[in-house]
C-alpha cells in the first residue's frame, strides 16, 4: 500500500521576486541576484509540504517578509575593510528568508503539531563580504530563536503577529539547510545552533550505506572530509565540493524518536536507480506521538 498525502501546504517565497534595488552590489537592478531571494522567476526553488494529516491553516504562519535587520545582533555582511556591504537604505529593506520560513500546523488527533520548514541560501556564490554565508547562518538561527523555550518577541509574521512557539509545542524543523556540521563552506557553527540546542533532539543522526559507498567510489574532495560520509544527504561535484550533510529533520526534545535514516541505497541495493532525480537524498524520521 502506498503512503498517500491528501493534504498540502504552499505559500509565496522570495526567490525570483524582484526587489527593485541593487542587492548584489553589481551596480545594476533587475537581475536574479537582486530578487529578495536569488531566482530568475517568482517561485523558483520554492517549497511544498505534503501531508497525511489535515492542516490547521488558520494557525499556520509565514515569515516571508521578515526583515533581516529586525533580528537582534544580525550578522550584517561587511566588506574586508569593515564597512557594511549594503548601504543602510538597502540593509533596512532586506528580507531574512531567501525562500521563506513556514510554521505549518497540523491537526493530529486533535492536537497541534508544527512543521517548521525553510530552505536557507547556499553559503557561497558571493564575495569576500560572505553575504550568503551570513544570511545562511541567520536563517538557521531564526528557528533556534523561534523554538527557544523562553519567548522571544522580535519575529513578526506576515500577518503582523509577533513571538515564537510556546515552550510545550510539538515540532520538527525540516528542510535543506545548506550547512554541514564538519565540511563545506557554511559559517562556523551555523548548523550547530540547532544541533547543540538542548530543547532540540539531534541524537538520531540519519545514515545510509549509499552515502558511505559513494564517498569512497567518487573520491576527490570526499577523501579530505571530516564528517561521516554515511550521514551525507547530497551528492555534489567531487572536485570542489564533495558530498555533504545538508538536509535535516530536527524534532523537539519532548518527542519520542524511534528511528531515522537517509534514503540512499548502495549500488547493489533495491531502489538505487531511483536516486538520480536529485542531487539531494530523502531524509526520514519516525516519531511516536
Predicted regions and their residues:
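Extracytoplasmic/secreted cell-surface and envelope-processing proteins
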Residues: 17-20, 124-127, 180-185
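Active-site His/acidic residue clusters
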Residues: 111-134
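Short Pro/Gly-enriched beta-strand edge/turn motifs at strand-loop
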Residues: 30-33, 81-89, 228-232, 266-268
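Active-site catalytic loop in hydrolytic enzyme cores
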Residues: 63-107
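Loop/turn elements at helix/coil->beta-strand transitions in domains of secreted/extracellular proteins
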Residues: 2-7, 109-114, 167-170, 255
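Beta-strand-turn-beta hairpins that frame and shape the catalytic cleft
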Residues: 52-57, 96-119, 289
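Metal-dependent phosphoester-hydrolase catalytic domains
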Residues: 50-72, 105-106, 132-173, 177-289
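Active-site surface patch of divalent metal-dependent phosphodiester/phosphate bond hydrolases
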Residues: 1-81
